[in-house]
Amino acid sequence: MNEIELIRTQLSVERQHATAVAWACVSALAAAPAAVMTSIEPFRAAGTEYLAWILARFEEREQVFHDLIRKRFAAADPHRQAVEAALGAPGSNREALAKLEAALAANPEANTTALRWGEFLKFFTGPWSTRRDELDRLMQLLPKVTDWRTVSAIDADSIVDERTRWARVKATMPPDTELSSNTLRV
């Protein structure tokens, strides 16, 4: 496996983990009555911290990718235009963070928690994921390993950091909450 494949694999793992955490948060937090929230607070903290962290990482990567494309290609270049169109599409990381914040701010007493977490998950698995798929496809056109290193900001330390956050989510998950089976292997 070459270095670009290793980076692509890590990016894929991060997306799988983020999706699993989003589903687990919805499962555990959307229907939890206010009285139970204190018992699952460690999971809530670990899950939302993971999601906020990973969304911020993807946001940084998109900015670096956009900067690289702007430096390398003229404004009329079709590849640059495709990247800029994808970056301008609905489903940004900032929008996902705003929906995550709304879910966290929802009042369990007012029965808005399930609605807000549902909105977050629908956005995350819909527009955010669609936009990510397109950006991932466009990144495939980067031929140089140095470009991949620069854009991804993946190194041994960042992988350990991601795995530590992932392990914290799994360790604090309520017993009746499950992660999707395809994410448990990593």
Give names to the regions the model predicted.
Residues M1-A56, E60-V186:
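Small-residue-biased structural context
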